[in-house]
Amino acid sequence: MIRFNRWKLMSEALELLGRATSIEAALEVLRAHARAIGCADGVTVVRRDGAEIVYAGEDAVAPLWTGRRFPIEQCISGLAMIERRPIYIPDIYQDARVPHDLYRPTFVVGMAMFPLGIGDPVAALGVYWAKENPAEPDALALLDTLARSANSTFERLAIAREIAESRPGA
């Protein structure tokens, strides 16, 4: 039943991404659907701002870092953006890249980060679990597909914005 629900949620998310008229709307689709698709305890949307990242939104069992900023090289979301690839960490306390002091007060034990944006990623989708080695391969594959679909949405929105700005009188 979980697998069916994941696919149903994925289908809904893809439809909503296809209708999104702003980056903010697309990010909201990600935030609202990723947690259920991944059977996760929390999700965050992290935006790149120069050499920093800012936690722009979250849906989690307990507060994480909404509104806080961190140097891009010192967090997994930043590394996923820099490396332009998803990062899955089944146990954050076994991975030296994770700033353990920042995570100790939270529920997070396992996590995955998915970069968002074509070319140079502009954001990342963070998915968090309260247990070690939590993610099923199906869930990770669907979350990766969701992030890639969001990338297509971001590209479509950027092209639409460029066209609108190039019109006389715009």
State where each predicted segment sits.
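Signal-transmission linkers at sensory-effector interfaces
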Residues: 1-24, 36, 153-170
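Short regulatory alpha-helical segment in sensory/regulatory domains of signaling proteins that mediates
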Residues: 14-19, 30-39, 44-47, 81, ...
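GAF sensory/regulatory domain recognition
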Residues: 31-35, 43-68
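Signal-transducing coupling segments at domain and membrane junctions
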Residues: 60-65, 90-110, 129
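Acidic/proline- and glycine-rich, intrinsically disordered low-complexity segments
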Residues: 64-87
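Sensory-domain boundary capping and coupling elements
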Residues: 77, 116-129, 153
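A short, aliphatic-rich beta-strand micro-motif
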Residues: 109-117
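Allosteric cytosolic regulatory segments
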Residues: 144-151
